[in-house]
Amino acid sequence: IEMPWHKLDVVTFSFQKGLGGEGGHGVLILSPRAVERVNSHVPAWPVPKIFKLHKKGGLDTALFEGATINTPSLLVIEDAIDALSWAEEIGGIEALLKRVDTSFVHFMDWVGASPHFEVLARDPATISPTALCLVISDDWFTAQPDEVQAGVVKSMLALLEAEDVAVDINAYRDAPTGLRIWGGPTVDPEDIASLLPWLDWAYETVRADLQDGSLHGDG
């Protein structure tokens, strides 16, 4: 995602997301203004060593020159370097952004045509182009009790996994019942485009099975 760097003083990100790496490691970026703040601010309370950026009257620059707070996994670091090398090979940040944009266009075009799904976010300004979150909007589904809705999604996920189409696309734990697809730059946009019709198929298959059995919806 393009970042409004002129508005940002401190940015953190994990290797896990855009680089498809380990979730327990990440990067801290400080703007010149943030560095000035670190140099001049004296905390009113004790700060744990692992969180200290200030040392001997100024910014602890060793943290930004390769010094480690704790012993990292070198395999994780090599994996991140490998991901950066791949990103450079395909065209750098511009290519990564294009992959995300293309996947998002595929996603939104499909949502606009699907009779069963809507994006989770109600405000278009809050729709994430990378965490592609869906809810099922079909009238039959929304008329079912919560436990049935959860069962429908669980059955859909099992079908998709059995067909080697998708794994681990359940909604976030605290989000409404639905699906969550990662549309970051490490995912081929054509894979996103190929996945989406399968979601309609999985829902229609599970709904038909339930309607033909003990559950009967309105549609």
Question: Could you tell me what each predicted segment is?
Answer:
Residues 92-99, 109, 116-123, 168-173, ...:
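Flexible, glycine/charged-enriched surface loops at secondary-structure junctions
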Residues 6-8, 21-23, 127, 176:
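Short, solvent-exposed loop/turn segments at the edges of secondary structure
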Residues 4-16:
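Conserved active-site segment immediately N-terminal to the catalytic lysine
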Residues 10, 25-29, 131-133:
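Conserved hydrophobic/aromatic beta-strand scaffold that supports enzyme active sites
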Residues 112-197:
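Conserved C-terminal alpha-helix-loop-beta "cap" of PLP-dependent enzymes
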Residues 187-219:
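Structural signal for terminal/edge beta-strands and the immediately following C-terminal loop/tail
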Residues 16-110, 123:
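Active-site C-terminal subdomain of aminotransferase-like
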Residues 1:
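Glycine-rich, mobile lid/loop segments that gate access to catalytic sites or pores
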